[in-house]
Amino acid sequence: MTKRILMLEDGNYFIGDAIGSEKETIGEVVFNTGMTGYQETITDPSYYGQIITFTYPLVGNYGVNRDDFESINPAVKGVVVREAAEFASNWRNQITLNEFLKEKGIPGIAGIDTRKLTKLIRKEGTLKGILAAETADKEELLHHLRSVRLPVDQVHEVSSAKAFASPGDGKRVVLVDYGVKSSILRELNKRNCYVTVVPYNTSAEEILAMHPDGVMLSNGPGDPKDVPEALEMIRGIQGKLPLFGICLGHQLFALANGADTFKLKFGHRGANHPVKELATGRVDFTAQNHGYAVEKDSLIGTDLKVTHIELNDETVEGLAHKEYPAYTVQYHPEANPGPSDVNYLFDEFMEMMNGKEEGELHA
């Protein structure tokens, strides 16, 4: 089997077996601790520009099926696994992981010590990495890797180019696409919502002209400070319409209301993150995928209150506006992959939109 190298910007490197596409690639090396859900993870637009390390030792054993994709075209740069299953065993399987990676042009590496790599990332933080042929000159690879700047226009790359509708006969929801997962759209469709998905740079005036019952801010990749156009839109919407944000949408909501965000050392990526609701003490296990978080101290003096925290590091996991029907969460209530403990948040959004009809808005 052809050999491949994963070179990190700190000079560490790993040599293993090549899987997927043969092309060379550069990205931010991160790790995901989920035991299952690799195909949802690989097709999640929030992973744009990243090389994903799966900590679970065997990946690909149940294959890949197109029904569970979170986007049509995966945006990941590469995949790292301890062992890639050569044969898939599942009645829904349509294609093996290796075949899928080749089809989508995603290079990968297998047979390396993913535990060692994960511990390295935990210690040093996320690092740039390059996947290349094992025969490549290591010094040249390292020099090239260190000279490359990772893109900052990630949301622009994964957002819808134009608005489109997913019809229903219930509440009318505008879903702002910063890299939305298909599962979020499906959760709204389950509740009979008429959903209009709009590009990330849609203005408040354009959204209000659609006369929706509520607005959702989706997940997405990268640094929220790279999407300044979203902040004015959020300020123009909150108080006029019920607002619900997820992941990147949560961070943008915080920035729009005067708070700050920061980059986590190695992020939260997995399906077992415990989150505590401060009002009730309820603890849920959640799916998470983010490299940035809201700075808790920056919320002092704003109109936002913390509703949820992550129990491992006490980072902010939920916010609510003190005056308006607007709330956001850092985690993923739609799951896929991960537990569906917090799926009820979509029902709370529906209740907020019902409150709009009853005149409960403060605008």
UniProtKB/Swiss-Prot annotation:
The catalytic residues are: 247 (nucleophile), 332, 334
What gene makes this protein?
carA
What catalytic activity does the UniProt entry give for this protein?
hydrogencarbonate + L-glutamine + 2 ATP + H2O = carbamoyl phosphate + L-glutamate + 2 ADP + phosphate + 2 H(+)
Its recorded name reads Carbamoyl phosphate synthase small chain
Superkingdom, natural source: Bacteria
Family, according to the entry, reads as follows: Belongs to the CarA family.
The record lists L-glutamine as bound by 46, 220, 222, 248, 251, 289, 291-292
Per the record, the pathway is: Amino-acid biosynthesis; L-arginine biosynthesis; carbamoyl phosphate from bicarbonate: step 1/1; Pyrimidine metabolism; UMP biosynthesis via de novo pathway; (S)-dihydroorotate from bicarbonate: step 1/3
Extract the HAMAP family matched here. Answer: CPSase_S_chain
Q: Where is the Glutamine amidotransferase type-1 domain?
A: 172-359
| Annotated source species | Listeria monocytogenes serovar 1/2a (strain ATCC BAA-679 / EGD-e)
Gene Ontology MF terms: ATP binding; carbamoyl-phosphate synthase (glutamine-hydrolyzing) activity; glutaminase activity
Please explain the role this protein plays, according to its UniProt record.
Small subunit of the glutamine-dependent carbamoyl phosphate synthetase (CPSase). CPSase catalyzes the formation of carbamoyl phosphate from the ammonia moiety of glutamine, carbonate, and phosphate donated by ATP, constituting the first step of 2 biosynthetic pathways, one leading to arginine and/or urea and the other to pyrimidine nucleotides. The small subunit (glutamine amidotransferase) binds and cleaves glutamine to supply the large subunit with the substrate ammonia.
